[in-house]
Design a protein with these regions (language model features):
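Secondary-structure end/capping motifs
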Residues: 30-111
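Conserved C-terminal helix/tail region of periplasmic/extracytoplasmic solute-binding proteins
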Residues: 102-137
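Periplasmic-binding protein-like
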Residues: 1-28, 39, 75-78, 119-126
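Generic alpha-helical propensity signal that fires on short helical segments
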Residues: 21-24, 46, 129-134
Length: 137
C-alpha cells in the first residue's frame, strides 16, 4: 500500500494555500530581526529537506510512525517537487485563500490581498545571497 495521491492541485492548475507563514504586521514592524531569523531558519530547513534525503526520511519516519518506507519515499518525492526553494509569498495563493475563506466569512471576499501580502522579507533575504549560498555548499 503506497502513497495514493487523490488530486494534484498543481497538475489541475488550482492554486491552493498549503504551506503558509502568517504573522501580524505589528510583529513585522516591531521585531523585523525575529521575522528575518525565522524565515532564514525556514529556508535552511527547506534546503536540508531538499538536499539531504536520508536525514529528511529519518525525521519523517520519526513523526509519521508506522508509515512504510514506500510511503515515506513517495511522500518525500511529492513534497520536494512541490516545495519552492525560495518561499516567496504568492498574491495568487493569498487571493485563492481569501476566496475559500469567503464561503464561511463572506467579508473575506472584500479584503484587498495586497493589504495582507508582504514579500519584502523574503526578497531581502534572497537578494542578500543567503539562499544561493545555501545551495552552493
Amino acid at each position: 500500500m503506497g502513497f495514493r495521491e487523490l488530486v494534484s492541485y498543481n497538475a489541475l492548475g488550482i492554486v491552493y494555500p498549503s504551506n503558509t507563514v502568517t504573522t501580524l504586521r505589528q510583529t513585522t514592524s516591531k521585531n523585523p530581526e525575529l521575522v528575518e531569523k525565522f524565515l532564514k531558519t525556514l529556508m535552511e530547513g527547506i534546503f536540508i529537506f531538499k538536499t539531504n534525503k536520508e536525514k529528511s526520511l529519518a525525521v519523517m519516519r520519526k513523526y509519521l510512525r508506522g508509515a512504510s518506507q514506500e510511503v515515506l519515499e513517495e511522500t518525500y518525492q511529492y513534497t520536494t517537487a512541490e516545495m519552492e526553494q525560495v518561499p516567496y509569498p504568492s498574491l495568487e495563493v493569498i487571493t485563492s485563500g481569501l476566496d475559500m475563506l469567503s464561503f464561511q466569512y463572506p467579508q473575506a471576499k472584500q479584503t484587498d490581498p495586497n493589504l495582507i501580502f508582504d514579500a519584502s522579507f523574503v526578497r531581502r533575504i534572497d537578494q542578500s545571497g543567503f539562499i544561493a549560498g545555501l545551495y552552493k555548499k
